[in-house]
């Protein structure tokens, strides 16, 4: 068994959609990034790539490549899954946390789990997502951005 750790952060800005776990969340701001800036999926992808010693999302989907401009991170997650399978790994589990002062994310977590389960073609009980705040501290607490952390375990076939 191997484990991987992922982390991502993006700045909150006006005139962008807020996408987390492939779910569009109603909010006055969204995350700034080259793709859809889905911090949850970016952290998950980095944890999976790390567990398989396949680098990180910047290596596979560079922000200097216009073909990834505005792309759905669900599509990128599907590509990461193909790489994992090609290299002989099976996902054992994923545990993630989203750190955001606002908006409240609990109502959207199950839909995020469904999206991730579908993109990775794994059972939903292998995916856990939590949401928390930093009690008004730091850049997430002052609502300047949202971050996410993810850990996963994979098994070599």
UniProtKB/Swiss-Prot annotation:
Catalytic activity: 4-CDP-2-C-methyl-D-erythritol 2-phosphate = 2-C-methyl-D-erythritol 2,4-cyclic diphosphate + CMP
Keywords: Isoprene biosynthesis, Lyase, Metal-binding
One example GO MF annotation: metal ion binding
EC number: 4.6.1.12
Gene3D superfamilies registered for this protein in UniProt: 2-C-methyl-D-erythritol 2,4-cyclodiphosphate synthase (3.30.1330.50)
Site (Transition state stabilizer): 34, 133
Cofactor: how bound: Binds 1 divalent metal cation per subunit.
InterPro entries in alphabetical order: MECDP_synthase, MECDP_synthase_CS, MECDP_synthase_sf
CDD domains with a match to the protein in the record: MECDP_synthase (cd00554)
Pathway assigned to this chain's UniProt record: Isoprenoid biosynthesis; isopentenyl diphosphate biosynthesis via DXP pathway; isopentenyl diphosphate from 1-deoxy-D-xylulose 5-phosphate: step 4/6
GO terms (BP aspect): isopentenyl diphosphate biosynthetic process, methylerythritol 4-phosphate pathway; terpenoid biosynthetic process
Binding residues for 4-CDP-2-C-methyl-D-erythritol 2-phosphate: 8-10, 34-35, 56-58, 61-65, 132-135, 139
Binding site for a divalent metal cation: 8, 10, 42
Matching PANTHER family: 2-C-METHYL-D-ERYTHRITOL 2,4-CYCLODIPHOSPHATE SYNTHASE, CHLOROPLASTIC (PTHR43181:SF1)
Subunit-level organization: Homotrimer.
Record's function text: Involved in the biosynthesis of isopentenyl diphosphate (IPP) and dimethylallyl diphosphate (DMAPP), two major building blocks of isoprenoid compounds. Catalyzes the conversion of 4-diphosphocytidyl-2-C-methyl-D-erythritol 2-phosphate (CDP-ME2P) to 2-C-methyl-D-erythritol 2,4-cyclodiphosphate (ME-CPP) with a corresponding release of cytidine 5-monophosphate (CMP).
Alphabetical list of HAMAP family matching this protein: IspF (MF_00107)
Sequence similarity: Belongs to the IspF family.
Name this polypeptide is given: 2-C-methyl-D-erythritol 2,4-cyclodiphosphate synthase
């Amino acid at each position: 068994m191997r484990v991987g750790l992922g982390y991502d952060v993006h700045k909150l800005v006006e005139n962008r959609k807020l996408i987390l776990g492939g779910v569009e969340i109603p909010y006055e701001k969204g995350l700034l990034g080259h793709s859809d800036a889905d911090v949850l999926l970016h952290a998950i992808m980095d944890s999976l790539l790390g567990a398989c010693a396949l680098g990180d999302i910047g290596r596979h989907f560079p922000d200097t490549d216009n073909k990834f401009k505005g792309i759905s991170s669900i599509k990128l997650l599907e590509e990461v899954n193909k790489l994992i399978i090609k290299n002989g790994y099976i996902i054992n589990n994923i545990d993630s946390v989203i750190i955001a002062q606002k908006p409240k994310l609990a109502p959207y977590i199950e839909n995020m789990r469904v999206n991730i389960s579908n993109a990775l073609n794994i059972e939903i009980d292998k995916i856990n997502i939590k949401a928390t705040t930093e009690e008004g501290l730091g850049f997430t607490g002052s609502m300047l951005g949202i971050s996410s952390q993810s850990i996963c375990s994979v098994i070599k076939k």
